[in-house]
Amino acid sequence: MSMFLGLLFLFPLFFILFKNLLPPRKKLPPGPTGLPLIGNLHQLGRLLHSSLHKLSLEHGPVMLVRWGVVPMAVFSSNEAAKEVLKTHDLETCNRPKLVANGLFTHGYKDIGFTQYGEEWREMKKFVGLELFSPKKHKSFRYIREEEGDLLVKKISNYAQTQTLVDLRKSLFSYTASIIFREAFGQNFRECDYINMDKLEELVQETETNVCSLAFTDFFPRGLGWLVDRISGQHSRMNIAFSKLTTFFEDVIDELLKTKQLDDHSDLVTAMLDVINRPRKFGSLKITYDHLIAMMSDVVLAGVNAGTVTMIWTMTELTRHPRVMKKLQEEIRATLGPNKERITEEDLEKVEYLNLVIKESFRLHPPAPLLLPRETMSDIEIQGYHIPKNAHVKINTYAIGRDPKRWTNPEEFNPERFLNTSINYKGQHYELLPFGAGRRNCPGMTLGITILELGLLNILYYFDWSLPSGMTIKDIDMEEDGALNIAKKVPLQLVPTLP
């Protein structure tokens, strides 16, 4: 009996000792309670960035949600984003292998969705040299200015009769024309097989499918694979991406009729030249799959994102007449009256336009969650343990609305950027429209130039007003989209000559 009592007395001591010998339990970020198998999927709505923002207000700027059975770390403050994208950039610069991304990129042969490694580095170097280098950017300046002239000419026809302009269609055509001429060597006005409306539909369908989830992505692999086949999800993705591939094959066939491959006048001819004369670029052997994947990347990232930002900017300017008036007065006073043509030299002269664009990026980042990252090792962010192979989301939408960082964050006020060094090039983590670190957007310079030039043209040459009977309060601000979050209801305005 006494031995039993002694053991009973010693047991708590042994338990405490044993517990102290165990490694300490790592502190995971807080997050909403999930359900078995599906995790938190039932709490995530159609607009993922908005759903995650609402959850972060309850659970904090570092949050863990379950994407089915997959852990997803969500970061909603500039401090946390800096730790991820700067301090732990190398450990978080991988991309998760998602079914849609693999199909879209022909087996991860691009630079946007490909996993981090030697092939990605070599491909990024090649594309940087053949499309995004300062030399190439300068050589393509005439294309951008010509398309700016054409945009003004088209809108002038509407202005003469004061007819409504669907800015989405006008600005999509302007952006797509530049991208196709620079990257693919194709001028829409010389191509009978390219229909702008059908191209816009194709881009939208592709973007929707790139961001759609396969059950394989978040269910146990065998179960997810089976559900994808039974539900037809895998088949739907294949059909959508095959349409894009067929379109690019037509572009390539047309280009081969008219271009010399060895002049490397655009990305497609440069890649075809390397493919047709087998050799390696560094350690990378470029294939036809690389070409189609890169064309897909350029269209997805280059065409829609710029259009979306111009539309949101014009929407906010229309909703805020004070800002519109101040901006147009500055533009016209700086550039002078009766200017025949806007050039890229003019972009550096209009300081307030730069502030307006920053504010538009803050409130309406085109891709509010950026592209997903994946941790390659266990890391610690803001004192929380983030496990290896967790998906990583940077919610730039939430960061732009953080009241701890911004005064009156829901207010459109470009003056907030006066006398600050904050820019959108990836060094300031409160404003990240192009991301930061190793996986930032390589086409940032081109994207910004297209955006600034388009806005400068339509704001210098035209005054803009709402349709008769419509007021500022009637402007619908509902969002829509998958990767690039656009204005759901088209922005239609009446242009007039000043």
Swiss-Prot record:
It comes from the Eukaryota. The keyword Transmembrane applies. Signal peptide: none annotated. The chain crosses the membrane at residues 3-23. It is a single-pass membrane protein. Heme binds at C441. It holds the Pfam family p450. Keywords: Heme, Iron, Membrane, Metal-binding, Monooxygenase, Oxidoreductase, Transmembrane, Transmembrane helix. It is found in: Membrane. This is Cytochrome P450 71B31. Its EC number is 1.14.-.-. CDD domains: CYP71-like (cd11072). InterPro entries: Cyt_P450 (IPR001128), Cyt_P450_CS (IPR017972), Cyt_P450_E_grp-I (IPR002401), Cyt_P450_sf (IPR036396), Cytochrome_P450_71 (IPR050193). One of its GO terms (molecular function) is heme binding. GO terms for cellular component: endoplasmic reticulum; membrane. Gene3D superfamilies: Cytochrome P450. Belongs to the cytochrome P450 family. Its cofactor is heme.
